[in-house]
């Protein structure tokens, strides 16, 4: 049912309100798992006393466990929104969650600003008390970034569901029932491959970070050898070259994942048909939601554990 208003004119309002409420709850869950005030991050800090291996293990555990509650909230919101207003209700839930977009973007930019402030304080050789203040601000910034990612992930999941239904209606014969039958091997194969795509993109991006970091390390070693007095604080390092390495690496390495994400569904549609693409969209959406929540919360918790 596309827009079956079960509760009359109030149906879209109820669905949009559910989107707002679910966004707030998902943000609170992200804060619990990433803020240094709560047990998950404190456990990672305790594990760090035993070595790097336990720190990584505990952080992975926190990230994985943090996926469950947001997905339950998203599932309940999706079901209730559909029950009161059909697929239009799911779209309205996405609109409700996106109503926070100005606040979430502002909150998300707080983290990098406070982090850079700490870097400036350290490079300017300010008093240790200044660095302590910026560290606390940076910790808050990590948490707010995780909260902002929660809103973005939730609204993106609702939007993806709405777009998926639009795709289904585009190829479904007129008058027939809208459905994706998972006994169809093409749909199942598409879902399996779609579930692997977010991991492929994530792997490519992580490898890109490693490549840029390797170039950065080589550049830092070169400067230590060729510019005497850096370690003693008598000479200034060449910051510009390091910044160019990181920015150029980020821009260049994003090209291939972006191209693949665009052409893969198109080529799959021409080769295997719309049912395969439908399964691909479902698998990629479900996998991407969980992977995004996991990586966002695990990274925020690790970053705050060192505070």
Model-assigned labels for residue ranges:
Residues 1-307:
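Hydrophobic packing and interface segments
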